[in-house]
A protein has these predicted regions:
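Short, strongly hydrophobic alpha-helical membrane anchors
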Residues: 1-12
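Pore domain of cation channels
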Residues: 20-25, 91-132
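Membrane-interface helix-loop junction between the first two transmembrane segments
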Residues: 26-48
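Alpha-helical transmembrane segments and their lipid-water interface positions
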Residues: 33, 69-72, 99-102
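Interfacial helix-start motif at the membrane-water boundary
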Residues: 50-65
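Outer-pore turret/helix-boundary of cation channels
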Residues: 64-96
């Protein structure tokens, strides 16, 4: 049997953590869009300023979401059997955020590669980043 499937409880934890992270990210994205929409609806705001508000707000929201996934990656790396990241000699928080950024944006330079159940979170993060 493939070693990836020997620890079903760890795989379940990764799926659960992924679902929770995606749910939180979607909620944050939704609430920020609602807030932005209300702010832009105010009369008297020049159109150019509305565009700037939109760009800066959405940039901030996406960066926040990258950090949220980075936290999930870092926490899952602490769980024995959840996988590891090739290219990350000593797992640390900033490398987890970097992995999250290249995954969320689907850049995928190839210098960090998730292995094991952690791939589920990474694949789902890429999908979330694409539709966000």
């Amino acid at each position: 049997m493939d070693p990836l499937y020997d620890h079903w409880h760890v795989n379940f934890l990764v799926v659960l953590a992924t679902a929770a992270t995606v749910a939180l990210v979607v909620l944050v994205h939704y609430e920020c869009l609602v807030w932005l929409s209300a702010r832009l609806a105010r009369a008297g705001t020049p159109p150019r300023r509305k565009v700037l508000y939109s760009i800066y707000t959405l940039l901030g929201v996406h960066i926040t979401e990258i950090w949220m996934f980075g936290i999930a990656i870092r926490l899952l790396l602490l769980v024995h059997g959840s996988g590891h990241v090739v290219g990350m000699a000593m797992p640390n928080f900033m490398d987890s955020v970097y992995l999250s950024a290249i995954t969320y944006t689907t850049v995928g330079f190839g210098d960090l590669v998730p292995v094991g159940a952690l791939r589920f979170l990474s694949g789902t993060e890429a999908l979330t980043g694409q539709i966000g």
